[in-house]
Amino acid sequence: MAVERRTVGIGYLRWLRDLWVRRDNRWVRRYNRTAPKLLCIHSHEGAWNAYNPAGPYYGSLQMDSSFMWAYGADKLAKYGGRDARYWTARDQLAVGFRAVRARGFTPWPNTARACGLL
């Protein structure tokens, strides 16, 4: 059975490129606004592999297990249920972005005040 090939016009390809550029720009703008704020929280909370046994809180954003399940269940599955101190910095920031989108900076009240975010 032969596969029919369709040619795509240059207009469609330009439209598709522009669509992806617009979507990418929207994400970049959102990232550029939030990333420095999360990095400020990171600088106050600890290293990427930080562990606070008194909490227990894990990772540089000091996430507890309920926080990780709420905003990073896919990351928990990716790392086989291991806590955030074993996650990459990129994965920890991705979970932080989700939390900021949902709740603002309230999960880190004292640190957010120190960073001037609350």
What do these predicted ranges mean?
Residues 1-34:
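Cell-wall glycan-active module
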Residues 27-118:
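Peptidoglycan cell-wall recognition and remodeling modules
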